[in-house]
C-alpha cells in the first residue's frame, strides 16, 4: 500500500498558525503548533480505501471506475432512441445513498442481460468502488467460473477463500451460470455461500447473461435464494462495450486526421 507522502501514513500533520488561543494565552498573534487531519490523504482515508481495493479483486480494467463513470444514456433502441433506464438508475442511486438500510435487509442486485458487453460487470465494479470509497467496507469480486479453483486453494496463514466470500460485507459473483452445467457439487458450493450470506444479511451482487430462472446448470434452491436476496436490474440489450470501443476508435481516427 502506498504511504501518504505528506503525513507518512499517520493521518495527521503538524501545522503552525495563529488562532484566538494565541491572543488569549500570550496576548499576541504568535503562531502555535496544532495537529490537523492530513489534507492530502484525508486523515488516512485514501490509504484505507486503497488497501480495501487491492484486496477486493476488482477487474483491472475497472479498478478506478465509479458510478459517475457509468453512462445510463448510452443505450439505444433499434431506431436509435435512448432507452429509458431511469428505473434501474433509481435503484442503484438509492442503494449507494442509503446503503445502511439496504444492508439491514441484506438485499443486493441481480444485474442481467442476454447481450454480452452491455456493462453488467462494469456496473457491478462501479457500485463496488463507490461503496468502498464512501463506506470503507470490505468487498470481494469473484468470477463464478473461478469458484472451482478458489475452492481448492489452501494457502498457509491465509483465510480460506470460500470463508472470505461468505463473510465479506459485499460480494460480487460475476457471470453466474457460465461453465457450470452438470456440476452438482458446484451448486452445493454456491448454495453454501449464498445461504450463509442470506442468514447473516450480507449484501451480494450478481451479474448474468440470463434471467435468474433461466440460468444454466443452477438448481432451484440456488435461484430461489438469489431471488430472495437481490433486486432485479435488467440492462438493455445493447452493447455498451462495442459502443465505447467504436467511440474510442473514432476519436483516435479524428486525431490522426483520418476522419
Name what the model sees in each region.
Residues 1-90, 94, 237, 241-259:
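A short, basic N-terminal segment
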Residues 96-100, 149-171, 176, 188-196, ...:
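Conserved alpha-helical scaffold flanking the Walker A/P-loop in AAA+ ATPase domains
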Residues 137-138, 167-170, 200-206:
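Loop/turn-to-beta-strand initiation segments
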Amino acid at each position: 500500500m502506498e504511504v501518504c507522502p505528506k503525513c507518512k501514513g499517520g493521518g495527521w500533520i503538524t501545522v503552525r498558525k495563529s488562532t484566538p488561543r494565541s491572543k488569549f494565552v500570550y496576548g499576541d498573534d504568535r503562531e502555535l503548533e496544532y495537529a490537523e487531519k492530513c489534507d492530502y490523504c484525508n486523515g488516512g482515508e485514501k490509504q484505507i480505501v486503497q488497501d480495501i481495493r487491492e484486496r477486493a479483486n476488482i477487474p483491472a480494467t475497472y479498478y478506478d471506475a465509479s458510478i459517475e463513470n457509468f453512462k445510463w444514456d448510452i443505450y439505444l433502441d433499434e431506431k436509435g432512441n435512448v432507452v429509458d433506464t431511469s428505473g434501474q438508475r433509481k435503484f442503484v442511486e438509492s442503494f449507494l445513498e442509503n446503503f445502511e438500510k439496504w444492508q439491514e435487509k441484506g438485499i443486493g442486485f441481480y444485474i442481467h442481460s442476454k447481450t454480452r458487453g452491455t456493462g453488467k460487470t462494469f456496473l457491478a465494479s462501479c457500485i463496488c468502488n463507490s461503496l468502498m470509497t464512501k463506506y470503507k467496507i470490505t468487498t470481494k469480486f469473484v468470477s463464478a467460473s473461478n469458484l472451482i479453483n478458489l475452492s481448492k486453494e489452501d494457502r498457509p496463514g491465509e483465510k480460506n477463500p470460500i470463508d472470505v466470500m461468505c463473510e465479506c460485507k459485499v460480494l460480487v459473483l460475476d457471470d453466474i451460470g457460465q461453465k457450470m452445467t452438470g456440476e452438482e457439487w458446484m451448486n452445493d458450493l454456491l448454495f453454501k455461500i449464498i445461504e450463509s450470506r442470506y442468514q447473516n444479511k450480507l449484501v451480494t451482487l450478481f451479474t448474468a447473461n440470463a434471467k435468474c430462472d433461466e440460468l444454466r446448470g443452477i438448481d432451484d434452491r440456488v435461484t430461489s435464494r438469489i431471488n430472495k436476496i437481490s433486486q432485479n436490474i435488467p440492462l438493455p440489450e445493447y452493447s455498451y462495450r462495442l459502443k465505447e470501443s467504436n467511440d474510442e476508435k473514432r476519436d483516435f481516427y479524428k486525431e490522426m486526421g483520418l476522419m
